[in-house]
Amino acid sequence: RDFTPREEKTGDVKQSIAERAREMADKGMRDNPYRNLTREESDRRAAAGEPFAIRLKVPETGKTSFEDKVYGLQERDYKDIEDLVLLRSDGHPLYNLAVVCDDIEMGITHVIRGQDHLTNTHKQILIYQALGAKVPEFAHLPLILAPNKGKLSKRKHGEIVSLTTYRDAGFLPEAFRNFLALLGWSAGEEREIYSMEELIEKFTLEGIHRSNAIVNFREGDPKHWTDDKAIWMNAEYIRTMPIADLLPYVKAELKSAKLWREEYAESEREWFEHTIDIIRARFFTLKDFSSQGRAYFSEDYDFDPAAIEKNLKKFP
């Protein structure tokens, strides 16, 4: 038990604790004055009503190690791991204890997560061992970063990280899934287009990259609002996927733009399918069918001023 009253620390006390921690770290010692408190003394003080937290007593010598399925052997000296708090004074568990207990309860055999959790893994292995539970296999994945090499997050980057943004911008689920899969993994082949079935068949932990992936976009630039590779891949899917698979997406887009006519599914079906098959080669997103392709489905459309200048005014 740690009897430091965490909820009542003043600024002076916090500063004193921080200074003590630095001094002890310089000496290779742990910042835990209650580490060697006897069980009797600990029980007595707890019974007397002193607030306390429960810590894990980490060995002073030796090291923890595990074979990560992506990054290989990972080792950390015990002296570099603090006597981590497991339970607060109010009895609530902290993150590391909670996730270990959850995984044990659910029978988790493989933990696959971002590489920013590598330091937590060493702590969690100690908790598994203390509880006498089998340690699962660990695989840590590279992170997805912004162009400035910072971690992508909803707080910092807003809509760029939202799946609904890509859906509303006219991305096909199949294409975006393919793009995401290749951000941190490779099948070791000279190809980039994979169906869901192929991704499942070819995926291995060994194919995961160790380096972080970067999504290249320019904030405030409508033309480059997301990675060019994502847009290219979406266009590739639009151009090459079976027309029967593409038509439902086009129908939904035309309905959204109030350009859909039921005749396209009945008496004009052959014309509609043939038209979509021709014009899709020029488009990058589903939105292009209702914008650039509007003239095929409506008499009400605008002419591109640049096209008028280039093509029509030549021939008055």
Predicted region positions:
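Residues that cap or delimit alpha-helices
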Residues: T38-E41, P242-D245, P316
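Catalytic adenosine-cofactor/nucleotide-binding cores of aminoacyl-tRNA synthetases and other
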Residues: L131-F303
